[in-house]
Amino acid sequence: MPLHIHFVGIKGTGMSALAQVTAHIEGAHITGSDVPERFFTDAVLERAHIPVLNFSAANVEKADIVVASAAYGENHEEIARARELNIPVYSYPQFLGRLMSKKRGIAVAGTHGKTTTTAMIGLALLQSGIDPTIVVGSDVPSIGGNAYSGQGDFFLAESCEYRRHFLNYSPEYLIITNIEFDHPDYFKDLDDVVCAFSEIAQKIPPHGRIFIWHEDPQRKAIQAQSPIITFGLNEEADVYATNIQFHDEGSTMTIVAHGTVLGEFHLHVSGKHNILNALASIALCLEIGVPTEKVLESLSHFNGTKRRFEHIGQNAGALIVDDYAHHPTEIRSTLEGARLSFPDRRIRAVFQPHTFSRTEKLLQEFSQSFQAADEVVIAEIFASARETNLNTISASSLADLISQQGVNARYIHSLEEIQTYLAQTLSPGDLVLTLGAGDIYKVGQSLVC
């Protein structure tokens, strides 16, 4: 009899991806439960023939293993019932670590760029015939969703530093896209974040490899027993890009790896940050034996992932784009990328701050992140379910600070009011860019309906 593995909160992006690859790797019977509200992952789970039930303690009674989303605590009826029956309960990172241990792991970590870099590598490996297993934190059209169950030796996974979750993994290869202070509800300061990345770097075996951004100020703090390969825009990096030209369809550049010119490369996603994501992907793929021409060709066809500078549509000659950026560096990079690709458009950024703790701790950094925008609209803060203190900072104070930086900024309380304001003020040539990890994407969708 195959194992029966039940996923509590299966509609989450990570959980739905994990459920799909579990069915393949474990040869298990998979069930899941979640709220009735429909998400994009419903279609993913339907295609995988994974049943999704309403929450009920009875759902776990015949399960051999329960995997629980971080969104639900020990008091949840299904988790509590599993504990009563002595059924093993895994967290998402614990179970991902279990699956990765069965293959050659590739972990993509870093404060920013994890999803895009994972998706880029996944596409390159698939198109080169390596056939990896992939778990990624977004819908990626080029790999057919947020997961792929391959027959090959490699297990590629987006790996988050929050609460040191990635220490549950034992990868052979590790990418660190960048290291910055984030998740202030867990990490004390930047040193604490660096310590976490050092801890996972030390888990990489001597025969493995670590790939890290050459220009990262924290790079030299990472100590490891395995060789470290650098990527960046500096010629001192092991893998770097030169002769970079930006245009409205992305960028063109020359790739150099370990002193050898690999050739010209076309990237169809905008911004310097995506060039760095591509360089990390190229460095990794070359190291594991993917032919140069396969790497460059496959990445030249990469068109992005859901909620990463995703083109939603147009309205009255205005372009509507959505992005998941919710950290000051991500916002700055996304807006600067938009300015490079669309120099003649009026850029109207609509930002929904994500969590009170992040907004409070990084308030000054946020206020200085919108210089590339012509106008900024700040929505109400999107609170995390794990937050208890919701009165530490206000969204209107962030709008005021942005205005003090010389940027036209305003606070508008509700998404409905923002939709109305934008609909009434759209002009041909505008670029409306919604930013945030909450539900701000609904604004862009409403403008193209």
UniProtKB/Swiss-Prot annotation:
Binding residues annotated for ATP, in chain numbering: 110-116
Locations listed in the record: Cytoplasm
Gene Ontology CC terms: cytoplasm
Pfam family, one: Mur_ligase_M
Classification via Gene3D superfamilies: Mur ligase, C-terminal domain (3.90.190.20), Mur-like, catalytic domain (3.40.1190.10), NAD(P)-binding Rossmann-like Domain (3.40.50.720)
Pathway recorded for this protein: Cell wall biogenesis; peptidoglycan biosynthesis
Catalytic activity: UDP-N-acetyl-alpha-D-muramate + L-alanine + ATP = UDP-N-acetyl-alpha-D-muramoyl-L-alanine + ADP + phosphate + H(+)
EC number: 6.3.2.8
Molecular function GO terms recorded: ATP binding; UDP-N-acetylmuramate-L-alanine ligase activity
GO biological process: cell division; cell wall organization; peptidoglycan biosynthetic process; regulation of cell shape
Alphabetical UniProt keywords: ATP-binding, Cell cycle, Cell division, Cell shape, Cell wall biogenesis/degradation, Cytoplasm, Ligase, Nucleotide-binding, Peptidoglycan synthesis
UniProt entry tagged with the keyword Lipoprotein: no
Enzyme class, UniProt record, top EC level: ligase
Known role: Cell wall formation.
HAMAP family: MurC (MF_00046)
Family label: Belongs to the MurCDEF family.
Protein known as: UDP-N-acetylmuramate--L-alanine ligase
Organism placement in taxonomy: Bacteria, Bacillati, Bacillota, Clostridia, Eubacteriales
